[in-house]
Amino acid sequence: MKENFNISKLKNGLTVLTYNMPYVDSVAINLITKVGSRYENSEEEGISHFLEHMAFKGTTTRTAKQIAEEFDEIGGHFNAYTGHEKTIYYARVLSENCDKALNILADIIQNSIFAEEEIAKEYQVILQEIAHSQDNPDDLIYEKFYSSVYKDQPLGKPILGASKTLSSFTKEHFLSFIDKHYNAGNLYLSVAGNVDHDKIVSSAERLFSSLKQGEKSNFLPAKYIGGNSFINKDLEQTTLILGFEGTPYINLERLYRTQLLAIIFGGGMSSRLFQHIREKLGLAYAVGSYNSTYSDSGVFTIYASTAHDKLELLYKELKTEITKMTEKVNEEEMIRAKTQLRSNLLMAQEKVAYKSEEIGKNYAAFGKYIPPEEIMEIITNIKADDIINTANKIFSSITTSAIIGPNDLRGF
């Protein structure tokens, strides 16, 4: 509900958003930085993620151990993650400890010291993270897949970066990146739960006043390119991914049409892919579809794993189902998909962590809060013909494929 939502902008330009949920005892805090891997140039690849790691390694007032101990002392859960377009630092604590959590988050964002010995240690940690990813067939195939979808573009590069660039980063590199992107105009503080907006604003003014004013960071437009790739790996099954140009999140009507398409086609146990590929033909255990979305681009993805000798049949059946999806959608499918989507969205509204991230991401993306009632109206007004038209648009785009399996399947 709109009356629970409040927004203020500090003198330095920092946006403070709150959503009051008086029936809970906790708060979720998100500090959203509008910068991620797609903002990096070729010499910076991996720095957004590396910086996120370094934020917890000590400040001018706290050691890394003290940061961890202080959060444990208030029973808090805190962490951070890096995406293509945002880096998010978050905490969840009891309402009575909100100010203490804000104090720690403000400290690590503004006062990290980037000690050279900590940089060297964390470099080794990230190398292990990369190695773990390379040993994971799912991570490996999706990395290859996106390198074809967004060939030679930041969106097509791994968020973790590569050892060549990671090994070059020094304290000066991190401080320069912070100076460029971690300014008040590019940050959003969002808090949801049992929260008093005026108190949050007062705390933010005290804790974030040293943030300099600045502009929002920009990136180059993404261009869907597509292509085919193959990874030779001896596994029990072969995994196939098919991709098409999807929908960006900036257009909500198109976005939710695509979301409904993904649900009908491969989003659940009653979906077409699950019923046909798994239940009827027994070709795959895991099969489905979804839309990955960015501010100016999107990728509609179909995935399935099968026995090596069934790959050709799987591909043929997937193509047949794609064709059928462009021809007809029945009312029962529409009702199920809308109910599923509405249920997921509305049930998520009850979680403080979701709500805090939602209001922050809404404002970072659209410059406003989009209440769930508005989303529900969009979903309600979508017709079967809208889904068919969306399917035709998406599936007529260039196909991207990625396969991981034994070498004799190359070029099947």
Curated annotation (Swiss-Prot):
The active site is at E52 (proton acceptor). Its EC number is 3.4.24.-. This is Uncharacterized zinc protease RF_0338. GO terms for molecular function: metal ion binding; metalloendopeptidase activity. Coiled coil: none annotated. Zn(2+) binds at H49, H53, E129. PROSITE patterns: INSULINASE. Keywords: Hydrolase, Metal-binding, Metalloprotease, Protease, Zinc. GO terms for biological process: proteolysis. Divalent metal cations. Binds Zn(2+).
